[in-house]
């Protein structure tokens, strides 16, 4: 697949087809090509001998997509930076990346060591350079970086994950084929562009001549606006975290009647709970549900499985799928040997989807990446096992805690808690006393119940948990809330929860 050429062909074949919609703003494939060409021409004329990455700042504005393509057409990787990212972190990204330029689609942070092109300046560039086309020889290709996404680092400093053109082509081609994506579909874009889940909809949509329907953080905070937008969208391909879908399922009208042409649900970024998938099948009986797995360092996702009722009945904890054909999975034991089928260990991903490492961080790169049989490999830090070719994810190795001498996985407890009657959503928060964990707190969004007192509801939930888990894994305390806080990326905001419950 020639990625950029594939996107550009729609500007010729279906120039008036809408490529991207956000609120009242939208762009066609013709406009996407013209404006990204103009921007690429300007970048190449301003930085003829430079290939440093370019920061792209904003939220869900159509200019974000134009800027991404303009950067790569001019031979520069782009770094998506969302409005929600604090100024201090933006500063550290600018310093670590060596970027010399920031393209802004919104009000911009100031005092950065880069040249800033404002939203108005961008529009001037689109106008004054219209009709100019960049030299296709300058475009990003092969093992050159296409985008760099910054993720959280254990040191407190963000890590820039370098994804090459070849990495992205490998992912996009697999996604289009394995998920049976068709020409001209409408894709939900829920994840901010600084979260690599957004790549799961951006490029599969653009290469198939689809329409990206973006919903922003303000809509998500106002369910009335969110569901009004969804009703207008006619979305056919849904891409989100499971947490976001779980939140939508709390609205009774979120069903086939709201989205009658829904064809495919694509989930990544978190564990897909069995009960969430089951509710989706009930609400959208004609749609296909795909559960996928992959870290940012391996280009969005490397495994997938069609979740059917048979799969739901067979597995209480859902498998995350079969590996894409050009990659392979190894399960490594603590002693460095490969675990046999069915035995747990660390998931290691090998193949062309794997990143070339962290930008400007050779020590971190050496720790997480290696070469196996001449191919790049990434040590994920995730626990899991493979059985009959199917990968089962068992949580982060660093989500395992030791409580009163017992080692346990928090996600396992959450899985069983969510399966209880009277529970709509739940997160386990381990509470420390000094340096050690003292007890487990369950933060629960209750479902329908007739208990007059909270302690009676707690007793009923604990009774069910006692049938599923050993006593030492039962949370000592329960807290009830109307919702679980989420990060801008659509994942459970564990840090915020911890600060709330320990305040």
Curated annotation (Swiss-Prot):
Spell out the PROSITE patterns in the cross-references. AMP_BINDING
Binding-site residues, ATP: 151-152, 291-296, 382, 393-396, 491
One annotated GO biological process? lipoteichoic acid biosynthetic process
A cellular component term, taken from the record's GO annotations: cytoplasm
InterPro entries (alphabetical): AA_adenyl_dom (IPR010071), AMP-bd_C (IPR025110), AMP-bd_C_sf (IPR045851), AMP-binding_CS (IPR020845), AMP-dep_synth/lig_dom (IPR000873), ANL_N_sf (IPR042099), DltA (IPR010072), DltA-like (IPR044507)
UniProt-recorded Gene Ontology molecular function terms: ATP binding; D-alanine [D-alanyl carrier protein] ligase activity
To which pathway does this protein belong?
Answer: Cell wall biogenesis; lipoteichoic acid biosynthesis
Chain sites annotated for binding D-alanine: 196, 300, 491
Keyword list (alphabetical) reads: ATP-binding, Cytoplasm, Ligase, Nucleotide-binding
Q: Which reaction does it catalyse?
A: holo-[D-alanyl-carrier protein] + D-alanine + ATP = D-alanyl-[D-alanyl-carrier protein] + AMP + diphosphate
What the entry lists under HAMAP family is as follows:
DltA
Q: What is this protein called?
A: D-alanine--D-alanyl carrier protein ligase
Q: Which organism is it from?
A: Bacillus anthracis
